């Protein structure tokens, strides 16, 4: 069996008669074959390898450009968002300050209106008291006048005769008519 294996190995290493073969044993090959193979690989493979590397380089550069554009866009959006945030914070501070000043203004207005209402109530109270005093005074006057009138009538009735009595009544009616015209 060893001979069969050796014969296959020897076939691989030795080319057939009239054909071209490649000796894979590095130590058994000569430098000319190696240089020819390397030269052919470099000559024909250089273009393919160069194209592959150029394509890869272009894809990497495009990816970098796209990433840079995306980064610039993200930075612009971030700056816009920061500007909007600053604007909103300023507006919020203004609303807060305006809210506090509005609260203070409303508080001041409420206090003032309360004082005005209290003053009006005090005036109404004083007017009511004055009105009631005047009414009480008028009632007392009327009662005193009625009592004086009744007393005078009683005195007159006891002292006067019928004719004098009629003249006195006529005079009093005339006085009441004159008083009524003055008060109207």
Curated annotation (Swiss-Prot):
Topological relation to the membrane, as annotated: Single-pass membrane protein
GO molecular function: proton-transporting ATP synthase activity, rotational mechanism
Subcellular locations according to the entry: Plastid, Chloroplast thylakoid membrane
Keywords: ATP synthesis, CF(0), Chloroplast, Hydrogen ion transport, Ion transport, Membrane, Plastid, Thylakoid, Transmembrane, Transmembrane helix, Transport
Record-level GO cellular component terms: chloroplast thylakoid membrane; proton-transporting ATP synthase complex
One Pfam family cited in the UniProt record for this chain: ATP-synt_B
Functional note: F(1)F(0) ATP synthase produces ATP from ADP in the presence of a proton or sodium gradient. F-type ATPases consist of two structural domains, F(1) containing the extramembraneous catalytic core and F(0) containing the membrane proton channel, linked together by a central stalk and a peripheral stalk. During catalysis, ATP synthesis in the catalytic domain of F(1) is coupled via a rotary mechanism of the central stalk subunits to proton translocation.
Record's miscellaneous remark: In plastids the F-type ATPase is also known as CF(1)CF(0).
Similarity remark: Belongs to the ATPase B chain family.
Protein name per UniProt: ATP synthase subunit b, chloroplastic
Native organism taxonomy: Eukaryota, Viridiplantae, Streptophyta, Embryophyta, Tracheophyta
